[in-house]
Curated annotation (Swiss-Prot):
Species of provenance: Pectobacterium atrosepticum (strain SCRI 1043 / ATCC BAA-672) (Erwinia carotovora subsp. atroseptica)
NCBIfam families named in the record: fpg, PRK01103.1
Cofactor note: Binds 1 zinc ion per subunit.
GO molecular function: 8-oxo-7,8-dihydroguanine DNA N-glycosylase activity; class I DNA-(apurinic or apyrimidinic site) endonuclease activity; damaged DNA binding; zinc ion binding
One GO BP: base-excision repair
Zn finger intervals (FPG-type): 235-269
Needed cofactors: Zn(2+)
Protein EC: 3.2.2.23, 4.2.99.18
CDD domains per the UniProt record, alphabetical: EcFpg-like_N
Keyword Zinc-finger among UniProt keywords: yes
Protein name listed in UniProt: Formamidopyrimidine-DNA glycosylase
Amino acid sequence: MPELPEVETSRRGISPYLVGHTILYAEVRNARLRWPVSAEILSLSDEPVLSVRRRAKYLLIELTHGWIIVHLGMSGSLRILPEYSEPEKHDHVDLVMDSGKVLRYTDPRRFGAWLWTDSLETSSVLAHLGPEPLEAEFFADYLYQASRGKKTAIKQWIMDNKVVVGVGNIYASESLFAAGIHPDRAAGSLNENDADVLVRVIKQVLQLSIEQGGTTLRDFLQSDGKPGYFAQELRVYGRNGEPCRTCGTPIETAKHGQRSTFFCRRCQV
C-alpha cells in the first residue's frame, strides 16, 4: 500500500507536468473505485492546474474552481505518459493535458479514489487529520503529551491518522526498530526521551524513503514508471526469520490491528 513517501514521490514526479498546464479533459474508463469518481471530474474541461499538494496520503490537485483529491488506495500509481499511449486493463483514469502528456491512474485492486471538493476546508476526508510528520507541528512534547494514558500498542497508535498522518505499516515498523522501542509497548509507557527519539527517527526514516523514491514491494511505481528503492534499506519489514542486521537475532513478526509487524526482540525493548 502506498504510504506517505510513495505519495510524496508521486507528487514531486507529476507536479512539473501539471502545474502551469491545462487539463483539456478527463477520460474515465472505470469510475467504480473505492468511491465512484466524482461527477465534477467527469465533466472537466480546460481547467488550469495551479498547484499539486499532499495532505497525509492524499494528493490535492488545485484547479481554478476546486480541487481533485486522489488517494492511491492499496495498489494505485500515477504515471506521466504521451497522450496517445494505449491504456491497459487496470488504467482507469486519465487527465489529458494541453502539453501532449497524460496523467494516468492505474489501480489493479480499485481501492483508490478520485474525489472533488470546492474547498479543502469542507472536505470530509481531510477532516480530523493529525499533524504532518515532516513538519514542525510534529514534535517530541506533542507526541509525549498525546500518549499519556494510552494503553494501545505503540505500533498501532502511531499508525492512527488522528495522532500523526502518513506513518503506515512499513514505516511504523522501521521507525520503532530505529528507536529501539518494542511494538507491543503501550503508547502511554513512552517517556520524554522515548518520544524525542521516536519523533526524530520517524522524520529520518520518512525523509530517507522519499529521497530513495519510496518502497516498491508489489504495485507502487514512480511517475516515470521506475520502482522506489527504499526496499533495499529495510531493516526489519518483510524480513521475518532473517538475522537482525544489528545483532543477528532472527526478526520476528506479530499482528497489530490485523497488520503484520516486524521487530527484533533483542534490539527493541
